[in-house]
A protein has these predicted regions:
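OB-fold and OB-like single-stranded nucleic-acid-recognition modules
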Residues: 1-219
């Protein structure tokens, strides 16, 4: 399994060198698709995909899928699927607050049935530019973690702003980055829950989706 994972990552690197944002996921849909919005050429439905790591931990990642790829005549909850697409950021307002949502936009989805024994996959490649000064901290395990926002261009003059997390040996190097640095990164998408304590009232819990960087190249 480990050798296959290494081969998959090498294939991903070769295949994605000519694009700026590419995601490959394989996991189980957690619910039925729900209508999200209607575009010019298609309707789009949202769902979440559950991915089991080799460590035994699970992550759920939100996905947006065109109706073209969805078999609406059958139940999709619990179905194992492979998705290829892009990790995108979307701005929206909640009350009087501006929010940013992260979502995988599916360019292709292949249903594989209900085979839970199939191997999961979570791979991402990004080619973009550091858009603000990195934030570095020491976590509770006494290890350095550096957060970087990567601006990744896509078609129609749009840009996605994607949070990336660097750990271990790459964290110190990432802490020295500055706006405008051109990076290519490989890794996986992860979800993380954090607690925000307002000045008054109950604590708020938020889920963030970010890229856990496993390899990087400065360009």
């Amino acid at each position: 399994m480990e050798n296959k994972t290494i081969r998959d990552r090498r294939t991903l690197r070769r295949e994605y060198r000519t694009v700026t944002n590419q995601v490959a996921l394989a996991g189980t849909l957690t619910e039925e698709f729900s209508f999200c919005r209607r575009g010019r050429a298609d309707s789009y439905y949202s769902n979440t995909i559950c991915i089991l790591r080799n460590t035994g931990s699970e992550f759920t990642i939100p996905v947006l899928v065109p109706q073209t790829w969805i078999p609406l005549s059958v139940s999709n909850q619990g179905r194992f699927v492979e998705i290829r697409g892009q990790f995108r950021s979307y701005n929206y307002t909640e009350g009087d607050k501006a929010r940013t949502a992260m979502q995988v936009f599916a360019l292709q989805m292949n249903p594989k049935g209900r085979f839970r024994s199939l191997p999961c996959m979570d791979q991402i490649f990004l080619d973009g530019f550091v858009c603000k000064m990195p934030s570095s901290r020491i976590n509770r395990n006494n290890k350095r973690v550096t957060s970087v926002i990567l601006a990744v261009n896509r078609s129609y003059a749009r840009t996605d702003y994607i949070p990336c997390v660097f750990r271990d040996d790459t964290a110190a190097a990432a802490a020295a980055f500055y706006p405008g640095v051109h990076l290519a990164v490989w890794g996986e998408i992860q979800s993380r829950v954090y607690e925000k304590r307002p000045a008054c009232g109950e604590p708020e819990y938020h889920t963030v989706y970010e890229v856990s960087v496993q390899h990087m190249e400065e360009r």
